[in-house]
A protein has these predicted regions:
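Acidic, mature catalytic/reactive cores of soluble proteins
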Residues: 20-634
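Short linear motifs in low-complexity or flexible loops
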Residues: 12-18
Length: 634
């Protein structure tokens, strides 16, 4: 069904084999040997799962993005929980999302036949189901089925039993797994058998045969939910996603990548609360084998603000109310108590701890849950919030008296503390600094608050904020710009640069073609390019107080595209954009970082920040191309 990205991920089988997309998937193999880019995302706007190319679901948190995982093989082994449904032995596997959806169809070709497996999570029904459908296409294929449930991030073995389904709601048998408050049930055309604490099965699928399996989560003290109508749900799920995707009004050359990125933002946004998680995973490393492993399953105010902007600029006006309301609820209360991130439901307690029972992806330890950055001071966040709400006002999303009162209080608090050092955009765990990007975003917060008064008739201390805006700008120009290097600097006490400086024109602080910004682009190219991609900053400078290194940051590389476009370097902008879009995996997903030497994805996956930056870069290129066409004589 559908159109748009219908063929996304399809590769001729011979080509796939040449690219090495062949593996023995039924073997007992450590999940960390699978590259990050070999995973695809399933989601229902409540939580998400990662399924590998060979059919193993190695990561799933239920019932919410930030709940403990019940399948955690991604960060350990199959003994930490997974759900495998795939061919035994070698297979050439290709996959695609059906239309503009998150219904994944994988085709496995073996020496004896071809099967298709369709995986999806129904949306819009308020349940937590994961459905897998297998269909024989030709010949006969031997299939391996494993259902290994381990609650508590792969540590807790549940009490598992096989019993008759509740007569009133289903027929046949089901397998239930229960531990404390959580319960899963597996239904299917052919249930696996208990083997040493796991459930396993092998069977043949011939051409024309259809089998269906579903896993459902519910609270253990509740009644077992009824089975779903799989055929109806798959059709409705594809339809709902495609209706949402059609609202995108972007018409530039990168529309396909923009639509997929918007879909990623939507699936990572909780359908009930409106909070967007930075990624559905924790502890996928920034350096394989290293300690830079963080939990991204929470809602950063920055990401929420930038998502609001991306949606508004892509034609999603009605939908932005959900995001705005989460943002306003999250920051409600005493401005002194505002955090940089919250739980999906707006909760404030996100204590960071390490899970010693998990070996980590590719041996990268520690595995962390929670995030200590919750207690950091990141002054730039207020600028992102006010910029997003200003854009919403400009596009007709009016403030309520309560929302403007809250914004006034937040800006007033910022005015009292703006010149204090902070941890910055990159959540530096080293000493607090006066980061230049943070100071610029103070200016942005004041500028957008002033705009609300001048253009929209809202009430506030206009002259006081104007004076402070001028003071902040003068300080940034004096202390955040290095005359000798001819560029802005990472913070006031260094000559180093970081990639956040590429954002200065996009927030209106300086013109795209200002010599001071053009010098900053040159400094970023000189200091931060690694194999043509952009690092966040030089870790060798020791500013972040952490051991080890990291790889180029995909969002930063998209920011360079935006900077090139604004500076009129359109050929270079398009060349870099084409390269970056091609770094997405076969179903259009991006991680946090990319290793250009090893040609592999790095970091939590998929990463909202990377997809946000892609959207911004595509829009900037479209605007620059249009302006260039208008200026070019016919």
């Amino acid at each position: 069904p559908g159109s748009g990205l219908r063929a996304q991920g399809e590769v001729p089988l011979a080509s796939a084999e040449a690219q090495g997309q062949v593996a023995a998937y039924g073997d007992v193999m450590p999940s960390h040997s699978m590259p990050i880019e070999d995973y695809a995302l399933l989601g229902d706007t409540g939580t998400a799962a990662l399924v590998g190319r060979g059919g193993s679901i190695d990561w799933l948190c239920l019932p919410r993005f930030d709940s403990p995982a019940c399948f955690a093989a991604l960060l350990g082994s199959r003994e930490n929980g997974r759900w495998l449904l795939g061919p035994v032995g070698r297979a050439v596997s290709t996959r695609r999302y059906l239309g503009d959806s998150f219904v994944l169809q994988t085709t496995h070709e073996t020496s004896t036949g071809v099967v298709q497996i369709t995986d999806f999570m129904p949306i819009g029904d308020g349940r937590a189901d994961l459905v897998r459908m297998i269909e024989g296409v030709s010949g006969t294929v031997r299939i391996r089925h494993e259902w290994v449930v381990r609650f508590g991030y792969g540590k807790v073995r549940p009490w598992v039993s096989r019993r008759a389904d509740t007569p009133q709601i289903g027929s046949g048998e089901l397998i239930s797994a229960i531990a404390g408050p959580d319960m899963l049930v597996l239904r299917g055309s052919r249930l696996p058998h208990a083997v040493d604490g796991r459930h396993e099965d092998e069977f043949d699928v011939a051409a024309g045969e259809h089998l269906t399996f579903s896993t459902t989560w519910f609270k253990s003290h509740h009644a077992v939910p009824p089975p779903i109508d799989v055929d109806d749900e798959v059709e409705q799920t594809v339809g709902r996603w495609e209706v949402w995707a059609r609202s995108c009004d972007h018409s530039g050359p990168y529309r396909e990548a923009v639509v997929r990125s918007l879909l990623v933002l939507r699936v990572l946004t909780h359908g009930g609360t409106g909070g967007i998680v930075a990624a559905p995973t924790t502890s996928l490393p920034e350096q394989f084998g290293g300690p830079r492993n963080w939990d991204y399953r929470f809602c950063w105010l920055r990401d929420a603000s930038l998502t609001l902007e991306a949606l508004l600029r892509s034609g999603y006006h009605e939908e932005t109310v959900l995001w705005r309301n989460w943002l306003l609820r999250a920051v409600a209360g005493d401005p002194e108590d505002m955090q940089i991130m919250y739980a999906v439901d707006g909760g404030r307690e996100l204590p960071e701890r390490e899970l010693s029972h998990l070996d980590g992806y590719a041996g990268s330890r520690p595995v962390r849950i929670g995030n200590a950055a919750v207690d950091q001071r990141q002054t730039d966040v207020m600028g992102e919030i006010m910029a997003a709400l200003d854009l919403a006002r400009e596009q007709g999303l009016e403030d309520t008296p309560e929302s403007w009162s809250l914004q006034r209080a937040l800006v007033a608090n910022l005015a009292r503390h703006w010149n204090e050092p902070d941890n910055g955009l990159w959540e530096i765990r080293g000493p607090l600094r006066h980061f230049t990007h943070s100071r610029v975003m103070v200016w942005v917060a004041l500028d957008r608050a002033i705009n609300a008064i001048e253009r929209h008739g809202l009430k506030g201390p206009l002259e006081r904020w104007r004076a402070l805006r001028s003071t902040v700008r003068a300080e940034v120009m004096d202390r955040g710009y290095n005359v000798e290097r001819g560029c802005f600097t990472q913070h006031y006490d260094t000559t180093e640069v970081d990639a956040s400086l590429l954002l200065l024109p996009s927030v209106g602080f300086i013109a795209d073609d200002d010599p001071r910004f053009l010098g900053t682009i040159r400094a970023v190219e000189q200091d931060l390019l690694r194999n043509g991609l952009v690092m966040r900053y030089r870790t060798q400078a020791g500013v972040d107080g952490l051991p080890g290194d990291e790889h180029p940051f995909l969002a930063c590389s998209f920011w360079l595209v935006t900077a090139y476009a604004g500076a009129g370097r359109l050929e270079e902008a398009h060349a870099l954009m084409h390269r970056l879009v091609a770094l997405a995996n076969d179903v259009g997903l991006l991680s946090e970082e990319y290793d250009p030497v090893g040609s592999r994805m790095v970091g939590n996956f998929p990463q909202a920040f990377s997809h946000l930056a892609l959207i911004r870069a595509a829009l900037a290129l479209h605007e620059a191309d249009s302006a260039h066409s208008e200026d070019t004589p016919s």
